[in-house]
């Protein structure tokens, strides 16, 4: 990665300098409580290194989709509190993004202080398609930092977005890749350029349309592509099988037919499914062969025979990439498929395989199921960004660091 890194910045000395850090702190909340602090934990090393080096650290991040205006339920207050706990030092929270409070607090910072700006997406310019609007916000962020400031990009989950705090601000300040962004790119480069064989990919999630580009990109390059989750039922429909009330993207059926024809030796789909009579945690359920889904029932997980088959593939692999759960893991009755796949990947890792969990719902599933992060070589913090990287797309937030 031909970019300046956080190590370069620290080696040059940060004492007394103000450093703006774009972190990815977009964690799940339930009633204001953080249910999975994984992204905050992953962001802490960069922030800790800067603060301990004597920098005045200003953190910018988003939470949820607040529609370009302040919304109390998307305040970063619980995130700032959790970050303070993890860092073991005070984290101030500004009452605005680049307004009077943010400016006053930034001017009052002393060496080693950490200031978090309020949710950057409270400002509509952050995600504007109008470059001039984004640049105005980027300049306001630079004003908080001052003339000898620096920018550290450490929010891997947003580097595929051309947004003010990710892309435009990097053009206005000396810019560096944080520890997290550097590690993520290194891992993904290994998956694309240096993967040990056999190479197995597991894709789940609800929609084929969300994963089509990555299927097209990876199918010619891997040994096995395992398909599960809600999108599997569109592949079933492509084989002329009735899927009952299961999720199915009618518009993608022909595309799935083409994929199954072209990559018959590579694509593996479940042979049995766990079906339910309704979408609920306490629905009546049963295990049926893939071609015997009853009318009015829906598939909510892969079945035990499929778990066995997939586990045999995965435990024999030397490289594994997993993105997307196998079923509705949030309901205990339908978590077994996702758990079985996760445990098989852990076993492969114990045997020496290089395993990557591709962020998003997969990372949430791993943690909800109580499987230690250490069971995998790497858990990505960026679902969409990791997929776009594997698709071969340019990531604006990385490209600008290379410029």
UniProtKB/Swiss-Prot annotation:
GO molecular function ontology, one term from the record: phosphoglycerate kinase activity
Catalytic activity line of the entry: (2R)-3-phosphoglycerate + ATP = (2R)-3-phospho-glyceroyl phosphate + ADP
Top-level division of the source organism's lineage: Bacteria
Record keyword Iron-sulfur present: no
Keywords associated with the record: ATP-binding, Cytoplasm, Glycolysis, Kinase, Nucleotide-binding, Transferase
Binding site for ATP: 211, 299, 330, 359-362
Pathway this chain belongs to: Carbohydrate degradation; glycolysis; pyruvate from D-glyceraldehyde 3-phosphate: step 2/5
Subunit structure, as described in the record: Monomer.
Protein name stated in the entry: Phosphoglycerate kinase
Source organism per UniProt: Rhodococcus erythropolis (strain PR4 / NBRC 100887)
Lineage: Bacteria, Bacillati, Actinomycetota, Actinomycetes, Mycobacteriales
This protein's encoding gene: pgk
């Amino acid at each position: 990665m031909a970019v300046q890194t956080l190590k370069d910045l620290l080696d040059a000395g940060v004492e007394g300098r103000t450093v703006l850090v774009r972190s990815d702190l977009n964690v799940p909340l339930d009633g204001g409580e953080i249910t999975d602090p994984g992204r905050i934990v992953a962001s802490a090393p960069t922030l800790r290194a800067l603060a301990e080096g004597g920098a005045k650290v200003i953190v910018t991040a988003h939470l949820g989709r607040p529609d370009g205006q302040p919304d109390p339920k998307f305040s970063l207050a619980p995130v700032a509190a959790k970050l303070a706990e993890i860092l073991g030092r005070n984290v101030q929270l500004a009452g605005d993004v680049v307004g009077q409070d943010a400016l006053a607090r930034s001017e009052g910072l002393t060496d080693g202080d950490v200031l978090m700006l309020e949710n950057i997406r409270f400002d509509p310019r952050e995600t504007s398609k109008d470059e001039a609007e984004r640049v105005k916000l980027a300049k306001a962020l630079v004003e908080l930092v001052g003339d000898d400031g620096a920018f550290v990009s450490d929010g891997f989950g947003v580097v595929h977005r051309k947004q003010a705090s990710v892309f435009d601000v990097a053009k206005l300040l000396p810019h560096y890749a944080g520890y997290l962004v550097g590690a993520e790119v290194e891992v993904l480069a290994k998956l694309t350029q240096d993967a040990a064989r056999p190479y197995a990919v597991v894709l789940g999630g609800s929609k084929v349309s969300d994963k089509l580009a990555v299927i097209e990109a990876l199918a010619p390059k891997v040994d096995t592509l395992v398909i599960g989750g809600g999108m599997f039922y569109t592949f079933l429909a492509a084989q002329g099988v009735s899927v009952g009330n299961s999720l199915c993207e009618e518009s993608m059926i022909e595309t799935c037919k083409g994929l199954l024809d072209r990559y018959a030796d590579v694509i593996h789909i479940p042979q049995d499914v766990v079906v339910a009579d309704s979408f609920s945690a306490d629905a009546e359920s049963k295990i049926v062969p893939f071609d015997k889904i009853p009318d009015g029932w829906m598939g909510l997980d892969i079945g035990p025979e499929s778990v066995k088959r997939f586990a045999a593939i995965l435990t024999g692999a030397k490289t594994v990439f997993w993105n997307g759960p196998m079923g509705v893991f949030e309901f205990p009755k339908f978590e077994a498929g996702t758990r079985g796949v996760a445990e098989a990947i852990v076993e492969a890792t114990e045997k020496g395989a290089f395993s990557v969990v591709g962020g998003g719902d997969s990372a949430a599933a791993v943690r909800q199921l109580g499987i230690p992060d250490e069971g995998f070589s790497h858990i990505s913090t960026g679902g969409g960004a990791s997929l776009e990287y594997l698709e071969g797309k340019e990531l604006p937030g990385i490209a600008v660091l290379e410029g």
